[in-house]
Amino acid sequence: MINVSPLLTFACAYDIIDHTIRPRIPWRYVAVTVARGYRYVDKTAGQKESEVFMKKVLLLGDSIRMGYQSEVKKLLENEYEVMYPEDNGRFAAYTLWQVNQAFKWNPDIALVHFNNGYWDMNIESPMTEAIHPVKEYQSFLRRIVELCHSCGATVVFATTVPILEAGSANDNTGTMGFIHYSNEWVKEYNAAAIEVMNEMGVVVNDLYTLCMEDERRYKCADLLHLSDEGSRRCAAQVADYIRKYAEGGNFSL
């Protein structure tokens, strides 16, 4: 049994399952108003009453993020509340909508770690240009960062991971998307993203360079998505960045 502290203010209906406060929406945790985290009193039978507090961290992005998210959550399970949507973040405009929904229900998120790129640069027939040409891509990245900062959260941006050779593959998360890819596109979009992040004082987690260490770029057979080892390597670096930067930012406890 869990007795929720009167310090909490809930923004929507919620369930408490396995000692976890869960909203009835597609996000892992419900909003509370306690210093960028949540607090509850655990009075489980046979245990001493204890108070638990963890900062909330939000992971957003495409299928690359979805590949490492569960490992990041596992690595940080005793340090931070790691949350993420079950849905693919696709392109930057879609991620902007996702982050807005996240703060709508979880205004106390301390840090947002996100990536966008493959979908933005994708040219999928019958379209003849990228979903987000570079300038549009930069515009939506700025809006994502501005929204996070306006809500008091620290932001970490992850670069798009490299491509071994140009080609195409189906998205593996059920979106029915078909992604065309080229490492020349990746380098162009990464440079554009880094320009924005430098302008806005955002930390860049260079997953591109990490994956360049492997001769196959830590890619699975479709040459787009990460191998299991690639997801583990990225998860470890993401967790390190979260540990380092979740204690800073433009908010105070």
Task: List PLM regions with ranges.
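Serine-esterase "nucleophile elbow" of acetyl-processing enzymes
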Residues: 41-108, 112, 226, 232
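Extreme N-terminal basic, low-complexity initiation segments
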Residues: 1-9
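Short, positively charged and aromatic/hydrophobic N-terminal segments
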Residues: 9, 16, 38-43, 50
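Alpha-helical cap/lid subdomain in secreted, periplasmic
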Residues: 74-78, 94-253
